[in-house]
Curated annotation (Swiss-Prot):
Keyword Transcription part of the UniProt annotation: yes
Catalytic activity: UMP + diphosphate = 5-phospho-alpha-D-ribose 1-diphosphate + uracil
EC number from the UniProt entry: 2.4.2.9
Protein name: Bifunctional protein PyrR
Lineage: Bacteria, Bacillati, Bacillota, Bacilli, Bacillales
GO molecular function, one term: uracil phosphoribosyltransferase activity
Gene Ontology annotations of biological process type: DNA-templated transcription termination
Amino acid sequence: MQEKAVVLDDQMIRRALTRISHEIVERNKGVDNCVLVGIKTRGIFIAQRLAERIGQIEGKEMEVGELDITLYRDDLTLQSKHKEPLVKGSDIPVDITKKKVILVDDVLYTGRTVRAAMDALMDLGRPSQIQLAVLVDRGHRELPIRADYVGKNIPTSSEERIEVDLQETDQQDRVSIYDK
């Protein structure tokens, strides 16, 4: 893969997450009855960062959960090729029934990951509302899904790939576009 450009650096990511945090607080009139749920793997770290910023804004801690969607993916057979899927499990510290759940992921592309995440959430409870926060929306939707909170819209071609690097997993914060 050939890197074409860095489209978000660490400062731009920090600003985008701060803006999303303010938007979440404003839209929900605070964060009472809200839970952030990160989709494994990078969505978890983004959710934790959002919770930290929201805590600074609101002066209260926000619950953060982890969602493993491995068994809910519709491309599982395409990925596994006769191997058993590696399931890490979900960890959501509160009952999500009647709560506003804000799903968090790094990149929104076809919408299939979000659909799988909603299926997984419904098996864990019945939230009053599901909202979606993403760092990057790259377009190319295959399902009627849109994000409520977007760090940056980055239009891409289907021949390009978006890579999100986060300090927690990649020792740096940046978003890059690559040729496939």
